[in-house]
Amino acid sequence: MDRTRRLRQTAVMRSMVRENHVRTEELIYPLFVMEGENIVQPVESMPGICQYSVDRMNEELDRVKALQIPAILIFGIPEHKDEVGSGAYDEHGIVQTAIRRIKKDYPDLLVIADVCLCEYTSHGHCGLIRDGIILNDETLPLLAQTAVSYARAGADIIAPSDMMDKRVGAIRQALDAAGFTYTCLLYTSPSPRDRSV
């Protein structure tokens, strides 16, 4: 026998099991920025989503603001990749450059910055590799350095999506030590679609 009345006993219980209402002010828009100029490149795995060069991203951000979406999650696509993902923590990297521009042109937009090395490494993994083994502990300082550089550029929230153990603690400690005690951390689940960009 189906007894749904069990789920209607209290206001809290009803609130927890009722239908969801998605509103634009609760959405976060993904923004993929790439190096280069005058680029708007569709992402095949995500219809309606494009990669933008910094000089063209405001076209999309104007649409985001018009829709009253209050936040973006920014992903970088660098031209240069190397074994240690140095583009991720380069103070003049693509994400850092884009964040500074966004905060200048759209100061009220909440900027969430994805932290992972996979897009910046020549091997495509989110950690350093030696002899075919991912070096977890050696990767943590690079992730922390990336997070601090994003915060320094103006990111409101740091969103680690890598798969290194103890990354959140390492990032939090580095942010605090650099004076970014009020910069928040938000977990983002790695998505095969994000990784296909």
What are these regions (language model features)?
Residues Q41-D55, G127-P141:
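Active-site mouth loops of central-metabolism enzymes
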Residues S86-A113, V168-L186:
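Alpha-helix-loop-beta-strand connector modules within alpha/beta enzyme cores
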Residues M1-F32, I39:
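N-terminal amphipathic alpha-helix/helix-capping segment at the start of soluble metabolic enzymes
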Residues Y187-D194:
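Conserved small/polar residues in nucleotide/adenosyl-binding loops
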Residues L27-P30, I72, V111-A113, I158, ...:
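Hydrophobic faces of well-ordered beta-strands that scaffold small-molecule active sites
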Residues Q41-I49, A71-H92, S161, D165-V168:
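Glycine-rich, proline-tolerant flexible connector loops at the mouths of alpha/beta enzymes
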Residues T139, D156-M163:
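Catalytic beta/alpha-barrel core
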Residues L31, M57, D114, Y150, ...:
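Conserved, mostly hydrophobic/aromatic
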